[in-house]
């Protein structure tokens, strides 16, 4: 997702931690988690 990458890059979940990432992107649902976990 280009929008996600522009917003904070693919390393966003590493920088802030998975808990923060999931909470921050809760509106994106599991789709966001799947993309970032891989």
Curated annotation (Swiss-Prot):
Q: Write down which residues bear the modification named Phosphoserine.
A: 2
Name a GO CC annotation attached to this entry: mitochondrion
Q: Where is this region: Disordered?
A: 1-38
Entry's localization field = Secreted
The alphabetized UniProt keywords are: Antibiotic, Antimicrobial, Biomineralization, Fungicide, Phosphoprotein, Secreted
Composition bias, kind Basic residues: at what positions?
Answer: 8-30
Q: Could you state one GO biological process linked to this protein?
A: defense response to fungus
Primary residence: secreted
Please give the function described in this protein's UniProt entry. Histatins (Hsts) are cationic and histidine-rich secreted peptides mainly synthesized by saliva glands of humans and higher primates. Hsts are considered to be major precursors of the protective proteinaceous structure on tooth surfaces (enamel pellicle).
- Return the similarity comment: Belongs to the histatin/statherin family.
Record's protein name? Histatin-1
Gene, per the UniProt record: HTN1
């Amino acid at each position: 997702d280009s929008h996600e990458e522009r917003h904070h890059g693919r390393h966003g979940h590493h920088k802030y931690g998975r808990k923060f990432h999931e909470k921050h992107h809760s509106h994106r649902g599991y789709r966001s988690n799947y993309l970032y976990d891989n």
